[in-house]
């Protein structure tokens, strides 16, 4: 069963490439404090949770299904119970989405570009992640991260983000698991086929970083998390780079790829 992971069901595809389940995000280890300077923590007043990625001082990229009222975006966070001097909080000034057509499926265009109400300052714990300059390569080892659940189906949420490695898989592996996926889409399939490591509730909108490049935005995955042969689904960022760059440059009428 596919689940759009918004608080109760988001993904943290923590697939431990060549490692055992002692290192899970439903598995994974605590992220190094310096490896997620671009990672945004997204909340609203009711506690709805997603992640996002800072791509420059004024813009954050996340999943469209993470859109909500009263959104607050936290940057420079590591331990939710400890506030660092350089933590910064912003709210959206503008939100940009891809226009959907009648031909689009639920898998399409799950991407939201947020302009912050004021620029953030780079610091020891805050720095943007560049957009990809090459398309993703099948078989790549990819990094996932977030504050999502570390157990499933009875979710327990950590105070610190967890990180793990997964593999970029052939699209057909996700087609075989999730009924109704089209023959082609702008979705990446990533995970570990044996299961045991996975993204989970609270990780939606977070980045998939393959060979050092920001290639995916967490869209959906299996429920419960970490089942065998149930990889995660990620919006393919490379396909949207022209749209993103046009919006940032002020061309707000720019169209997304079909």
Swiss-Prot record:
Record GO cellular component, one term: secretory granule
Tissues/organs with expression: Expressed by the venom gland.
Pfam families xref list: Trypsin
InterPro entries per UniProt: Peptidase_S1_PA (IPR009003), Peptidase_S1_PA_chymotrypsin (IPR043504), Peptidase_S1A (IPR001314), Trypsin_dom (IPR001254), TRYPSIN_HIS (IPR018114), TRYPSIN_SER (IPR033116)
Residues the record marks as active site: 65 (charge relay system), 110 (charge relay system), 204 (charge relay system)
A molecular function GO annotation: toxin activity
Keyword flag Protease: yes
Pro-peptide region(s): 19-24
Its biological purpose: Snake venom serine protease that may act in the hemostasis system of the prey.
Name of the protein described by the UniProt record: Snake venom serine protease PTLE1
């Amino acid at each position: 069963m596919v689940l759009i992971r918004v608080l109760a069901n988001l993904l943290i595809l923590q697939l431990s490439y060549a490692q055992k389940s002692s290192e899970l995000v439903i598995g994974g280890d605590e992220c190094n404090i310096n490896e997620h300077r671009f990672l945004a923590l997204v909340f609203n007043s009711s506690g709805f949770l997603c992640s996002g990625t800072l791509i420059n001082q004024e813009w954050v990229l996340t999943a469209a299904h993470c859109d909500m009222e009263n959104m607050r975006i936290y940057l420079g966070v590591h331990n939710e119970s400890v506030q660092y001097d350089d933590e910064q909080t912003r709210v959206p000034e503008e939100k940009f989405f891809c226009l959907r057509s009648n031909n689009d499926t639920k898998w399409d265009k799950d991407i939201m570009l947020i302009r912050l109400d004021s620029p953030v300052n780079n610091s020891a714990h805050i720095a943007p992640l560049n957009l990809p300059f090459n398309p993703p390569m099948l078989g790549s080892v990819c990094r996932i991260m977030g504050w999502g659940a570390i157990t499933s189906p009875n979710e327990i949420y950590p105070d610190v983000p967890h990180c793990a490695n997964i593999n970029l898989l052939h699209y057909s592996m996700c087609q075989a698991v999730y009924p109704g996926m089209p023959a082609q889409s702008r979705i990446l399939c990533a995970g570990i086929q044996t299961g045991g490591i996975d993204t989970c509730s609270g990780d939606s909108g977070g980045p998939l970083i393959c060979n050092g490049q920001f290639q995916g935005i967490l869209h959906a995955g299996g429920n419960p998390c970490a089942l065998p042969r149930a990889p995660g689904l990620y919006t393919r960022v490379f396909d949207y780079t022209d749209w993103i760059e046009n919006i940032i440059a002020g061309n707000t009428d720019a169209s997304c790829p079909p």
